[in-house]
Structure formats: C-alpha cells, structure tokens
Amino acid sequence: MAETLSGLGDSGAAGAAALSSASSETGTRRLSDLRVIDLRAELRKRNVDSSGNKSVLMERLKKAIEDEGGNPDEIEITSEGNKKTSKRSSKGRKPEEEGVEDNGLEENSGDGQEDVETSLENLQDIDIMDISVLDEAEIDNGSVADCVEDDDADNLQESLSDSRELVEGEMKELPEQLQEHAIEDKETINNLDTSSSDFTILQEIEEPSLEPENEKILDILGETCKSEPVKEESSELEQPFAQDTSSVGPDRKLAEEEDLFDSAHPEEGDLDLASESTAHAQSSKADSLLAVVKREPAEQPGDGERTDCEPVGLEPAVEQSSAASELAEASSEELAEAPTEAPSPEARDSKEDGRKFDFDACNEVPPAPKESSTSEGADQKMSSPEDDSDTKRLSKEEKGRSSCGRNFWVSGLSSTTRATDLKNLFSKYGKVVGAKVVTNARSPGARCYGFVTMSTAEEATKCINHLHKTELHGKMISVEKAKNEPVGKKTSDKRDSDGKKEKSSNSDRSTNLKRDDKCDRKDDAKKGDDGSGEKSKDQDDQKPGPSERSRATKSGSRGTERTVVMDKSKGVPVISVKTSGSKERASKSQDRKSASREKRSVVSFDKVKEPRKSRDSESHSRVRERSEREQRMQAQWEREERERLEIARERLAFQRQRLERERMERERLERERMHVEHERRREQERIHREREELRRQQELRYEQERRPAVRRPYDLDRRDDAYWPEAKRAALDERYHSDFNRQDRFHDFDHRDRGRYPDHSVDRREGSRSMMGEREGQHYPERHGGPERHGRDSRDGWGGYGSDKRMSEGRGLPPPPRRDWGDHGRREDDRSWQGTADGGMMDRDHKRWQGGERSMSGHSGPGHMMNRGGMSGRGSFAPGGASRGHPIPHGGMQGGFGGQSRGSRPSDARFTRRY
C-alpha cells in the first residue's frame, strides 16, 4: 500500500499538472465517447457504485441520467479536462510500467482535474509554461510506457474496480481519524479545482505520467481509509524494512527504484546506477521519504503535493506528506518523460532529493513511483522505525531549504533545444539534478523555457553568473532564479494541518520511522538541516499510513490548493493535484501496486514491435506476392496475346495466299477462256472459209460442167472428122480474121465479175487446174517436156500456129495433119495454167489484159501476140510474186489461138466467170 500510495503521489502530481493544464470548462459529450475514468467520475458525482468494466459503468450512468430526467446521449462534463487527461493517460500509460499509478489516475481523472488545476496555478506562479521533458531517459521511459500501457490498460481498469471494492471494505475498518482525514482531503481537492489550466506538459512522456499520477493521487486522497491495511502491512514490515533500509540505506531504495524502472523500462537500470553514484545522498533521502510514503500511501500523496510547494520550514509532518506526494508526481513524470533518464532511477532519486530541498517532501515522491513498481519493497520500508522517519523529516526540510535556490529558468531557448542540451550546458558549472524544456500549452507556438535544478544553490548561482545573456543554438538565453517560496509557504500551511493529523495517528509513525531511516541516509549524503529533519519526523509521525494521507489532504486544503513539486531528477517543477474520490483511489492504488508488479514483466519495446514487424513483413510479402502474381498474369496474358496475334497473322497470310491462288486461277481461266474464244473464232473463220471455198468449187464445177457441154459437139465433130468441113473452115477463117483484127475484142468483158472472188484466187487456180487436168488429161507434159520449156514451146507453138494459120488462110488449105486442133487447144489451156501456177502471179486487172492486147497487136501474128500478152500481163514470172491475179481465162486463150466461133458467143458466161 505504501508503495502504491507513493507511486500514486508521484503520478498524481504529474497527473495533476496534466489535468490542471486542461481547462475545467464544461461541455456536452456523448455517453459512448466517455472513458472509463469519466464514467466513474460521473457515477461518483451521482453517488452510484463506480466499480466494474466499461459496459457496466455505461449502463449505470445511463440509468442514473435517465432517472434524473436528463439525456443519456449528451452528458455535461469538463470536456477540455477530459480531453487533455485522455491524452496524458494514453501517454502516461507509458509510465504504466508503474501501472499502479496509471490505474489510479484513470479512475480518478475527474477528481484529479480539480487538484491538477490548483497545482497548475502554482506552476504559473513559478512561471512554468508547459512542462515538456526532453531528457533521454525520460524519452525512453515514454516509449516503454506506451507499450506497457497498451498491454495493461484493460488489466488496470479491472484492477482499479477491484481495488475500489477492497478500499470500501477497508474504509469501514479504518479509524474515524482516517475518515476525517479523507474528508479533509476531499475539501482540499475541491479547493484545488480552481487552479488554472494554463500549463500543459508538452512532452508526451511527462503528460502520460501526470495523468496516471494524478489519478493515483486522487485515489490516495479519497481513500485514506485504505491506509489501514497499509498500516497493518507497515507494522508487519517495519522491522524487516527498517533492517533493509538501515543496512542498505539509499542503496536499497535505489535498487528498488531500479527494479521499478527495469520493470517498466529495462534500459533504465544502467542509468540509475550511474546517477546513483552522483546523487547518492539525495537518493537516500528520497528513498527514505518514499518509504514513508509507501507506508502511508493515502495521506502522503496529498501532503506531499502541498509540501512540494513549500521550499522551507513548514510543519515537518505537513511538509513531508506534501513533499512525498509531489515527489511521487515528479518521479512519475520523470519515469514517463525520461526513458533515458529512467535508466538512472537513483539519479532521479538524487534529483528528486534536490527538489525535496526546494519543497521539503519532494524527495519522498520520486521514490514513490519507483517503489510503486516495487510495491513489496515499499511495504518492507513501511516497517522502518519512527526515529528513521524523524531523521528523514529533518533531511527533507534541509533539502527544501537548499532546493529553493537551486532552480532557475532559462528563457529565449531555440525551438531545437532539448533538455539534454541544457543539462550538458549547465553541467559544466556543477551537477545538474534536473532539466526540462516547457512551453505554454494554451498558446500554440509559444516560446520554450528551460527549468533547471542544480545540486546546490551555489552551483545554480554560478550557472546564472556564467551563462546569463549567452548564446545557445544561435539564440540569446537569459538565466534567472526560480521563485518557489510562495509555493513553499502554501505547503507549509498544509504541513501544519498535516502535523495535527500526524499526532492523531500512531500507526503512521511506524512508517515514519522507516522514512526516518531513509532520511538519515539522505542526511548523511546531503547534511540536511535539523529543523527540516524535525518537520519530516513530525510529518512521519502524523502519517501512520492512511492517516498521513488524510492529513496531507487536510493540509493541502488549508494551504494553497495547488502545489508545485520540484522534480529534482529533471530539475522541473511538477504540479500535484488532489481530487475527491480519494478513497476509491486508495483501493485503486493497491490494485495498481499489483499491476505495477505485473508490469515488471512487461515485454520490452522490441518485443512489442516484433508482432508489428511480423505483420508488416507479412503484409509486405503479401503485397509482393500479389504484385508478382499480377506480373505473372500480365506476362501470361501478353504471351497469349502474342500467340493469338501470331495465329491471326498466319491466318491472314494463309487467306492472302489463298486469295492470290484464286486470283491466279481466275487469270489462268480467263486466259484459257480468251484462248478458247480465239480458237473458236479462228475455227469459225476456218469453217467459213471452207464453206466459201466449197461454194466456189461448186460454182467452178458447175461452170466447167456447162462449158464442156457447150464445147463438146464441136470437139466431137472435130475428133470424129479427120478434116474440118469446108463450111467450118470458112467460118473459122472469117472468125479468126475478125477476131484478131478487132482491137477491142477483150473490152466487152463484164468487169464486175472479174473481182468477185479475189481472196480465193489460189483455190480457184488449184480447182481449175485440177478440173482441167481431169478433163484434158496428160497431153501437155508429154508433148512439151516440162514447165521449163513452156515459154519457148508456147512461143514456138503460137508462132507456128500463127504462121500456119496465116498460110492456111492464104492458101485456103486445112492445117497440117500433124496438128490436132482439139488436142492443141487442150494443151494450150494446160500450158497457160501451168505458166500461171509457176509464176504465182494471177492478175485479173483489165488494164493488164489491155496491155496484153496492145502488145499482142503490136506483134506480127495473133499467135505471137497472144503469147506475149499472156506474159506481159503478169509482168514477171518470179515464183514468189504476188499471186492476186486470176488465171488467164481458158476460153480467152482458146479463142485467141483457136478462133473457134468467137464471134458467135462474144459474151459467153465463161469469160466473165473466168475473170
């Protein structure tokens, strides 16, 4: 219990600061938006049971509001305070390593806000704007605390509800004095509600620590009754704890604090050891105070807050109680704010001791958070002897006096300046107990200020002299002493009331003895003043556990409602506020002790990150697999698309080839069709020609048949008679003379029939020749011996014929018997046709016949002329000459040399057709 209470005191102080920073303005919020702390605060206002989980609390509150006739969906609460406390609670769950404090803060946030506001006003008096701790240790603590808070938030709420029930049971058993003290504490808390919310802790770590601390303080104040079991524990543990404290002294407390920090922040252990060597005396005093606080958790946190404000000589009992609570707050802030600083819990003790000098009980509080984590050790410390508690009181007073001049403000800081920078800067001129960088939360973007606590006032003065108006990070800084006296006076008033309370409770003195032992150790280290020691002893006596808690609350109500505690480890003032409902908080503080022990087994920050890392890696792997799968699908789709395109191209190429083949086939068929058409035309032409030739042959045959019919009687007569009859000879002569003397005997031919068949001269020639050959036989070749002799023979023949004819005409004798005129006529026809065939020149031109006629007339003798006419009519006997001419008419020749009845048939059809 003592440990829990001390832890609550620390966290309560920090929480008070956080809550006070939040304004107490009221606003409407939905029931579902309220946190467990808010729900319990509303239930407490309505005197309704506030134990149970969130769902049960919401049901109760809803029913209570409906009974009042209000709207359960909209509840009027201090909205700003709640919001800010919620922030800090989430952050302050970082210090939940000291889980006890955090739980208390959560439940009592409503009450704690009032106390915090009052303490914040004190901070304003000290010119503190928002406290934001930048120390390395504090930062580390914050991160660890966050992890712890996340893991144990649910457990804390449950433990808080259980602790409330336990506290209620204890309350009944507690002596009336304790109840009175609790009542006084509530009054003090109500007074503190007026505190301003100007200052807000900037640093996340510090803020979270403040809220849980505040809640713890509220629990301690409201549940002074709970201190009764603490008294029992303290009585049991007094002897062993006294032995432990006497033997170990500050070291034991440092070890406990280290354990606490290690549970919450395993890294802090090493730093704690380092700081332990530097501030061994201070840490010992703080440890002793913490032991007292642990014994009387309910009273001490409240008193500690008030005493923190008091720098010097107030009633020792009051100072110690207030200082213990304030120190608890400061320590909780340190734990939350300085993860790096946390590694040195002992160093914090030393720093807290420095603050205790400023505010007599400051030292008590810092060990309280450490001891809250190590609740068992705290219980043992409760059993320390009363003498030790008296010694502790003296040391606290000395510390408070000395700490008054150890604090100073640094203004004009750069926005990049951290608490570690200040610590490094001022450590050149002495040991820096604590350093913080704060700003005004109400005005965002406000300038930052530094609050530094040195181990001694001389070192602080040296720092002010050397570093005032110097440059840091490109900015001119001014260093001025902090004014802590008004707060100290208020805490002294509280201590007076606490002193009265101390007299009323004897059981608390056992815990005070334990504190005295611790104070003795601290006195050895810091050589505290005797007066302050006496005050601390008185305070220890007054605080026999829960009774001290009640006294602290009473003193707080009597003194200033707001108390500022100097966080000596960080050199920053911390506001501690006490709120109503402290009774329930006391039970919560016990639960928090157990929670803090559980938190000792809190996993490290890396372990907390491991599942997150694994989840991230899994998500990354899933994303990577999904992207790879998409890429594979894309590649497959592209491949299939390429294949489809290739197939389509092949199909198109095949179609083009097929079309080309078809086109070529069509062209071939067209060519064949044209060829066939051409052949068909040629065939038609050939057939036409054959038909025409056949018709011509028929005509020629007809003519030839008619001609022999006309000529046959003459031939028969000539053949039958060896000599021509006289009549015929006379007629023949007459005809010859008339025919050959007549110049135009060939001009009566029908020229229209002459070119009737010009294209078929060759056929006609052949046909006529064949017919003549058939008709006339083979007499010509036999007589004339071949075509080569034709010209001469014919000429000779014609010449002879002509001479013979003339002679016959002149003599009147028949022609010589050797000549057969009929045969000769036939032979002449053959000869003439033979010459025509040899020359290949058949011309039916009438002019040629005329020329022939003229040439014939120009010669002597009709026979000669006939022969020459035949030749000249052709113009040439070249074999390849044009063969357009007609063969010489048979009848013409015959008539030429025969003179046979030429005049009787001058217009014979044979002449026309022949030409």
Curated annotation (Swiss-Prot):
Residues bearing Omega-N-methylarginine? R811
Glycyl lysine isopeptide (Lys-Gly) (interchain with G-Cter in SUMO1) crosslink site(s): K578
The cross-link described as Glycyl lysine isopeptide (Lys-Gly) (interchain with G-Cter in SUMO) comes at K231, K294
Q: Where is the composition biased (Gly residues)?
A: 892-901
Q: Where is this cross-link: Glycyl lysine isopeptide (Lys-Gly) (interchain with G-Cter in SUMO2)?
A: K172, K186, K381, K392, K483, K514, K543, K570, K578, K847
In the record, which positions carry Asymmetric dimethylarginine? R868, R874, R884
Comp. bias intervals (Polar residues): 275-286, 371-383
Q: State its location(s).
A: Nucleus
Summarize the protein's role.
Binds to scaffold/matrix attachment region (S/MAR) DNA and forms a molecular assembly point to allow the formation of a 'transcriptosomal' complex (consisting of SR proteins and RNA polymerase II) coupling transcription and RNA processing. Functions as an estrogen receptor corepressor and can also bind to the HSP27 promoter and decrease its transcription. Thereby acts as a negative regulator of cell proliferation. When associated with RBMX, binds to and stimulates transcription from the SREBF1 promoter.
Subunit-structure text: Monomer and homodimer. Forms heterodimers with SAFB2. Interacts with KHDRBS3. Interacts with CLK2. Interacts with POLR2A, SRSF1/ASF, SRSF9/SRp30c and SFSF10/TRA2B. Interacts with isoform 1 and isoform 2 of SRPK1 and inhibits its activity. Interacts with RBMX. Interacts with FUS. Interacts with ZBED4.
Q: What protein does this entry describe?
A: Scaffold attachment factor B1
Give the source species: Homo sapiens (Human)
